[in-house]
UniProtKB/Swiss-Prot annotation:
Keyword Phosphoprotein applies: no
Family assignment from sequence similarity: Belongs to the snaclec family.
Binding site for Ca(2+): 64, 70, 142
Matches recorded under SMART domains: CLECT (SM00034)
Any one GO MF annotation of this record: toxin activity
Location(s), subcellular: Secreted
Pfam family, one: Lectin_C
Organism: Gloydius brevicauda (Korean slamosa snake)
Protein name: Snaclec salmorin subunit B
Signal peptide as annotated in the record: 1-23
Residue span(s) of domain C-type lectin: 32-142
Tissue occurrence: Expressed by the venom gland.
Amino acid sequence: MGRFIFVSFGLLVVFVSLSGTGADCPSGWSSYEGHCYKLFNQQSQWAHAEKFCTLQHTGGHLVSFHSTEEADFVVKLAFQNFGHGIFWMGLSNVWNQCSWQWSNAAKLKYEAWAEIYCVYFKSTNNKWRSRACRMEAYFVCEFQA
C-alpha cells in the first residue's frame, strides 16, 4: 500500500511538472517561451489586424519578435499551416516615433509622407519586408501567457 501511494505521488509530481513547461494557451493557440500565438486565415489591413488582435485576448497584439528562435518558431508555424503567404507583424512606423532631423540640424516641423509602412514576414523565411499598411495580408496575434 505504501509503495502504491509513493508511486502515485511520484506520477502526480511528474505530471504537474510537465504541465507547467508550456504556456497555458487557449485552445487553437500555439505556445512558445511563455507566449501564445495564433495565425488567422483572413487578410486585413495592418490597423484592422492590430485591433482584431487586441480583441482576441487581454494584452494581445500583432506578433513581435525578440529572438531568432521565436521568429523561426512563428515562421515555421505559418508555413506548416498556410504554405506560402505574407503575414503582418506588430512593427510599423504608424506612430511616427522616429526622431527625424534635417541635415542642417533644424527640427522637423512640416511632414508630407506619401505612405505609412508596416512590416511583414513571408512564411518561407524570417526576413522582414515593408509595404503600405493599407494593403492586406494574413496576420499573427500574440499575447503573454
